[in-house]
Regions:
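Terminal leader/tail segments of proteins
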Residues: 1-126
Length: 126
């Protein structure tokens, strides 16, 4: 049986039935009804949003890279809203470990670097 480090650490991923909206500087930078929520012991739930539901024109890739033994190597982006730049506020595991493959193609936002990560009923307006 293959070892599954993330599962062994109690990390789970599930579909979020709600609408998730990320705002920075009064602007919506992500809006989805297809978010995945990652749960890990001792940490807040983290929303992962499909790239196709993120305004990628507002993101600029940075040189920062980190490694997580459970998820893999993370790449980072800064958010640009007008003259404001929020450094390394977004990350993605572009080639995650096999048991975290569900988050491939998804982005996550640091809640303390954006104005809001809102969860609403799926049919709610912006």
């Amino acid at each position: 049986m293959a070892r599954r480090p993330a599962a062994d650490a109690g990390i789970t991923i599930a579909a979020n039935p709600n609408r998730v909206i990320v705002r920075v500087g009064g602007e919506v930078v992500a809006d989805t009804t297809r978010a995945l929520v990652m749960r890990a012991p001792g940490t807040p739930d983290q929303q992962y949003i499909p790239r196709t539901d993120v305004d990628m024109t507002r993101l600029a890739r940075t040189d920062l890279a980190t490694h997580c033994p459970y998820k893999g190597d993370a790449s980072y982006w800064s958010i640009q809203i007008g003259t404001r730049t929020v450094e390394n506020a977004v990350w993605s595991y572009e080639t995650p470990h096999d048991d975290m493959a569900a988050i491939r193609g998804y982005l996550a936002f640091y809640g303390d670097r954006v104005d809001a990560v809102e969860e609403r009923p799926p049919d709610s307006p912006r």
